[in-house]
Amino acid sequence: MLILQKLFDSVKIEIKNSHTIDKLDHIRIKYLGKKGIFSNLIKDLKNFSLEERKKYFIIFNEIKKKTINQINKKKIELNKIILDKQIEKEKIDVSLPGRRIKNGVIHPINHTITYIKNFFSKLGFESISGFEIEDEYHNFDALNIPKDHPARNIHDTFWFDENRLLRTQTSSMQIRIMKKEKPPIRLIFPGKVYRNDYDSTHTPMFHQVEGLIVEKNINFSNLKWIIYNFLRNFFHKDIAIRFRPSYFPFTTPSAEVDVVTNNGKLLEVLGCGMVHPSVLKNVNIDSNFYSACAFGIGIERITMLRYGISDLRSFFENDIRFIKQFKHI
């Protein structure tokens, strides 16, 4: 019986001198584990008489229970010390001023798209988003773009398979809308388009806004008036504009629109024209009763001109210093 008491005294000293949870676990396993000291003491009972065994068991269980309580008590104490240290480490002085929340800045591309939406809404245009993954029919066939056209080449277009691709122009939305809606139609389609090109004036992904009007008696003069007014409003000045005859498979006549830059050079900013009768036929609109005009604006290009940005790639490099320049636009 004296052995048990000495054992408990030894346990108490070890528990008292343990300063970590790991050390305490080691003590627990040493004394209370399956192969621990208390388990081994049970084996000695075979040498005791029945009466001695009863007395031994009473003291044994009492000592074992005290040992468990001592270990649990010490564990609570050590956990409290750990928690106190953690709280002290993470202590916050509420009297200190808080960190200032920095305001975000609208990206110049988003700002331009918003400006365009607001301008054309005043002329009765609605804005609709479209699919960025298109099929060959809506992106090419229905827009009167033949099979041998260079734009359909794998070097210029991102193809998923023989039929699906990343749209190369927002014009594909013209087909989808004209199939569903009956004239009169006045819509713009802002969105991303994709072409396999990358340099200071081209990126594989860029933004366009397509405009479409389908009405009776709409003509090229109406289209010119809209474009003149938009560009002069956008650049906030009576900017010199040139309509240059061009070719697009889906419009006839077609034109590219150039503006005079600050250094006196002409720069193309958009394409436009009267929607080709074949395109109207593809969407079951009778070109004898209705005419249609369309225009496509390159968002990055007019934004570069407006704010004097020299490299198109700056829009997509995520340089916060670049974005901050447009804080007050």
From Swiss-Prot:
Does the keyword rRNA processing belong to this entry? Answer: no
Answer yes or no on keyword Ribonucleoprotein: no
Spell out the reaction equation it catalyses.
Answer: tRNA(Phe) + L-phenylalanine + ATP = L-phenylalanyl-tRNA(Phe) + AMP + diphosphate + H(+)
Of the GO CC terms on this record, one is: cytoplasm
Q: Can you provide one Gene Ontology molecular function annotated for this UniProt record?
A: tRNA binding
Instruction: State the top-level EC class.
Output: ligase
> Which keywords does this chain's UniProt record carry?
Aminoacyl-tRNA synthetase, ATP-binding, Cytoplasm, Ligase, Magnesium, Metal-binding, Nucleotide-binding, Protein biosynthesis
E.C. no:
6.1.1.20
- Pfam families annotated for this entry? Phe_tRNA-synt_N, tRNA-synt_2d
Cofactor stoichiometry and binding?
A: Binds 2 magnesium ions per tetramer.
Note the InterPro entries from the entry.
aa-tRNA-synth_II, aa-tRNA-synth_II/BPL/LPL, Phe-tRNA-synth_IIc_asu, Phe-tRNA_ligase_II_N, Phe_tRNA_ligase_alpha1_bac, Phenylalanyl-tRNA_Synthase, tRNA-bd_arm
Q: Which GO terms describe its biological process?
A: phenylalanyl-tRNA aminoacylation
How it assembles, according to the record, is: Tetramer of two alpha and two beta subunits.
Q: Which family does it belong to?
A: Belongs to the class-II aminoacyl-tRNA synthetase family. Phe-tRNA synthetase alpha subunit type 1 subfamily.
Q: Which PANTHER family match?
A: PHENYLALANINE--TRNA LIGASE, MITOCHONDRIAL (PTHR11538:SF41), PHENYLALANYL-TRNA SYNTHETASE (PTHR11538)
Q: Can you say what this protein is called?
A: Phenylalanine--tRNA ligase alpha subunit
Taxonomic source organism: Buchnera aphidicola subsp. Schizaphis graminum (strain Sg)
- Gene name tied to this protein: pheS
